[in-house]
Amino acid sequence: MHNPDGSASPTADPGSELQTLGQAARRPPPPRAGHDAPRRTRPSARKPLSCFSRRPMPTREPPKTRGSRGHLHTHPPGPGPPLQGLAPRGLKTSAPRPPCQPQPGPHKAKTKKIVFEDELLSQALLGAKKPIGAIPKGHKPRPHPVPDYELKYPPVSSERERSRYVAVFQDQYGEFLELQHEVGCAQAKLRQLEALLSSLPPPQSQKEAQVAARVWREFEMKRMDPGFLDKQARCHYLKGKLRHLKTQIQKFDDQGDSEGSVYF
């Protein structure tokens, strides 16, 4: 109990003098004996979140650097081009280059090749000129067939063999002359008929055109007659065979004359 003069009571606890009235009011009374009073929870010292004012989060400003001319840059200089809109006023920035475009380097003068007029003419002639008788690409020429008489009648090695060559020559020489005469006469007639048909004036009517066409067909039939073609081929074969026999006989005779002759 407090006295009106404000001094403490002598019956009071000496330790209670240090407590304030607010602390004494907060302390719960001690539980009575025989009664289990429910424990009161101590109010939290924290204030509700609603009492705090929401403050915006501080934003971190980008570092500012000074360029070579003393101007402030909001972004540090990097390998890429400066961003548009962040460059200081009064400073012009070049347009960004695409990464695939090569940087312009020093101009290199190309060496010029001097070509004379005669060289151009020679190159043009070489390109236009083709070898005569050249084998086309991919074409395999057929081997030239060797006549059978060249294999059947080798060079003469004895007098007996020479006599056999002479007999064959004389036997087929008469046949050759006969065939040559027949084939020659037929070829002469065909040449005359062809010249006559070529000299005829153009037909004036349909009948004349039909006659001329019939004569030309007969001319082609005679020239392509199988009997005439066989005689012509036989005559050509005998001519080559007789020439080969004559050459082999002459070589043997020339060799015998050179061996039997004596030089002083």
Swiss-Prot record:
Residues 1-10 have a biased composition (Polar residues). Disulfide bonds: none annotated. Residues 147-257 form the OCEL domain. Residues 1-112 are annotated as: Disordered. InterPro entries: ELL/occludin, Occludin_ELL. One of its GO terms (cellular component) is bicellular tight junction. Residues 96-105 have a biased composition (Pro residues). GO terms for biological process: bicellular tight junction assembly. Belongs to the ELL/occludin family. This is Occludin/ELL domain-containing protein 1. It comes from Homo sapiens.
